[in-house]
Curated annotation (Swiss-Prot):
It comes from Photorhabdus laumondii subsp. laumondii (strain DSM 15139 / CIP 105565 / TT01). It is an enzyme of class 4 (lyase). This is Pseudouridine-5'-phosphate glycosidase 1. The keyword Hydrolase applies. GO terms for molecular function: hydrolase activity, acting on glycosyl bonds; metal ion binding; pseudouridylate synthase activity. Keywords: Glycosidase, Hydrolase, Lyase, Manganese, Metal-binding. Pfam families: Indigoidine_A.
Amino acid sequence: MNISNKVPFKFSLEVKEALESGKPVVALESNVITHGLDYPDNVTTAKNVEQAVRESGAIPATIGIDKGEFLIGMSDEQIEKFATASHVPKVTSRDIPVVLASGGMGATTVASSILAAEIAGIKFFCSAGIGGVHRGAETSMDISADLTQLTRSRVAVVCAGAKNILDIGLTLEFLETWNVPVISYQSDDFPAFYCRSSGFKSPQRLDELAVIAKAIEINWMLPGGKGVLITTPTKPEDALDNQKIDIIIQEAVLEAKKKNIVGNSLTKYLMRMVDRETDGISAKANMAVLVNTAEVAGKLAVAACLQSSTFFARIKSQ
């Protein structure tokens, strides 16, 4: 059954032709355009990320929702529309039915982008960092849908680890419990967004993209094999000091508790506080992380195609 025929999708011509011809495609989220960066940095970064994917040999597919249908691949005009709109709701997996049914507009998170990518037949997705288990989740139960979607969708996610504002130790425990393979590319450490190390060792290290592609393929052949998380640290010249960032976050978490900031608002508040306390340096680091992960994701998608011409067809048929 072709689910994409039943869910309202609008493919860009570039993405449609790439998927039909078996070319490597990398999905991208739109939440970073509407909520992650300010204008015009959001537009510049979105285009730079797409260009990084193209220069790696793959086709970028920025995902969003507009007029009640998924956009799989955005034009420059559509990116500009998302970047300048006064209010675009942040849409995670559970919000998709309501936003599509109401004919509205929505910026897709990691979780909803992964879901849309899977339905569209795209096997690779990249983001600066995934959501995870929040600090204090033992009482708040604040766990990102990014994690649960990884356990459900057969998509390989390339990122710079989990955001520093999270409890990364518990995030790794969650991924282990739900059998999500975590592979760090050319690094022993699990990165933390714009910090090269979170202080935690990565469960697995692989140094060749072709081997990572093979591991992904094998995972999808196994019963129950779903998402795979591939982490790549930001470049040394773009990295921030993990200890300094952690001190800022600890203080921001305390302030958030005093102000009763919870749920979807918490992540944005904490990231804004980090940006403020670093005099905007973290925002620039964020942009660099996005481009770096896009480059690696593109190369990985290409490696998957090169190692086996039937890679995507074989997985899709299962």
